[in-house]
Amino acid sequence: MIGNIKIIAVCMCKVYDERNYRIIRALNNFAVENDYRLFVYHTCSDLYWKTLSEKGEQSVFDLIDYNITDAVVTFEEGVYAENVMTKIRMDAAQYGKPVISVGVEHDDCISIKFGYAKGFEQVVRHVIEQHGVRDIGFIAGRKDEENSEERIAVFRKLLEEYDIPFRNDVFYYGDYWSVPALKAVDDMIEKNKVPRAIICANDMMAIAAGAEFQRRGYKIPEDIIITGFDGSEEANFCTPMLTTSGCSYDDTAKTIIDVISKALAGEKPEKIYTVDYDLSVENSCGCKPSVEQINTGE
C-alpha cells in the first residue's frame, strides 16, 4: 500500500497484444474505481526460447516490492516459463500476499478460469445446428497444448453427438498462428478436399484462412463457412466479419477486483472462479451480422 492506495502487481508477457491490452485496460478501470492501482510487470517475449535475452527480460519480476504490494495477479497463458510464474507465487506467499492466477489453475493460489470448452462448443454447435453443416474441417492450436487439445475433444464430441464423420484429411495443427493456417488452406485446395466449413481454434488462424480462401477465389460463407475463437477485435474488421466466441473483459476485470477485495477483507474466496465465453454470431457463417459491416472490402 502507498498512502491509502492498495497496490496490485500484475505479471504477464506481451502486454501490447490486443487481448492483454484490453484486459489490462478494463482491470485498471475497475481498480481505480475501488482505490487500487496497478503496477504492471511484463516481458516483451513469451520466454519460449530460453535465450540470454529472455533470461534478462524475466528479471523484471524481481523488481516486485512485496512490502508495498497488496495482491498479485498472474496471467500465465502464453508464458512459456512455468518456473518464473511459480517463483512469483512462492515469493508472494512468503509475504502473505494473495495471488490470483488468471487462465491457469493452480493449487497454491486462487484461480480464475475461462469457460473455453463451453464457448467453443457453442461455436461448433451453431455451425452444425443452425447451418446444417456435416462436412467440417478443423484447424487446431498447438499439438499437446492443454487448451488446444480441449478444443479438439469438444469438436470430436460434437461430431459424435450428431453422427458426423471426423475427417482426418482436413484436420491440421495451426499453432495459433497465421502461417500454418495458410499452409492448411493451400493443402486443402491443392488436394481438392475443401470442406463446407472450417472451425478454427482461434481468430488469428480463422482470419488468415478466410483471407487465403478469398485470394484463391472462394466466397465466404457461400462456398465455405469460417469460424474463429477468442472474440478478438480484429474479428470485426475482416470481410466478412467473423463468427467467434469471447469473454467480457469487464466481467473478467470485475471478478479479479472482487476476489482481491474479499481476500484483503479477511474473507475466504473460492479457490476457482469461471468467466464464461459468449457466442458472437456474424456473417462468416452465413448469419446476419450484428452490426453494419465495418470493412466491406470495397
Predicted regions and their residues:
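Flexible loop/turn connectors
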Residues: 34, 184-295
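Short beta-strand elements in bilobed, periplasmic/extracellular small-molecule ligand-binding domains
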Residues: 32-52, 135-138, 156-179
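Periplasmic-binding protein-like
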Residues: 9-11, 64-79, 100, 135-140, ...
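Alpha-helical recognition/docking segments in bacterial nutrient-uptake
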Residues: 1-125, 190
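Hydrophobic alpha-helical segments within soluble ligand-binding/sensing domains
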Residues: 4, 89-90, 107-138, 150-157, ...
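Short, solvent-exposed amphipathic alpha-helices that sit
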Residues: 19-33, 119-123, 146-165, 180, ...
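Hydrophobic/aromatic beta-strand patches that form the interior of the parallel beta-sheet core
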Residues: 73, 100, 110-113, 137, ...
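An alpha-beta-alpha
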Residues: 121-164, 169, 271-287
